[in-house]
């Protein structure tokens, strides 16, 4: 007999507390579903912005004497193109959290409203990516973080 690991994070209910972090496995519906079907309690999409971004040129991962160093530069297809992937993961039964980012509170709120259309369960705000000057600035200023969170929460009905 298995253990009941159901977890609640605010209004968001998870079948267990393991969550795929935002990253390269969160770019397509099939990859999100692979992680979901492997037992994750929720899956988080790759961070997405209003417009597409190519990120840094290769190599984005290099081996060092101490291990691996990764710097992707927030590549993403833009919110319009990721909606189908999010919908596919939702149709497969996954609990989906969309990771969003922008240059200011209005852009964060816009992207959050767009991903909400795909019926995602919650929104994650990428507030502190060290590879983005705007996000680095936002993440270091509590007042800016508060403004982004407030703006985003005002714009969506799902948990932020």
Short names for language-model regions:
Residues 1-160:
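Flavin-dependent oxidoreductase catalytic cores
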């Amino acid at each position: 007999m298995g253990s009941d690991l159901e977890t609640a994070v605010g209004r968001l209910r998870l079948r267990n507390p393991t969550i795929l972090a935002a990253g390269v496995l969160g770019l397509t519906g099939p990859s999100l579903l692979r992680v979901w079907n492997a037992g994750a309690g929720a899956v988080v999409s790759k961070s997405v912005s209003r417009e597409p971004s190519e990120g840094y040129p290769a190599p984005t991962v290099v081996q060092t004497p101490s291990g691996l160093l990764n710097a992707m530069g927030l590549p993403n297809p833009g919110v319009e193109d990721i909606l189908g992937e999010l919908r596919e993961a939702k149709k497969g039964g996954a609990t989906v959290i969309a990771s969003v980012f922008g240059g200011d509170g209005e852009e964060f709120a816009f992207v959050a409203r767009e991903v909400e259309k795909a019926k995602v369960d919650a929104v994650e705000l990428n507030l502190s990516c060290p590879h983005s000057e705007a996000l680095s600035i936002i993440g270091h200023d509590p007042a800016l973080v508060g403004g982004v969170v407030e703006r985003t929460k005002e714009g969506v009905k799902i948990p932020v």
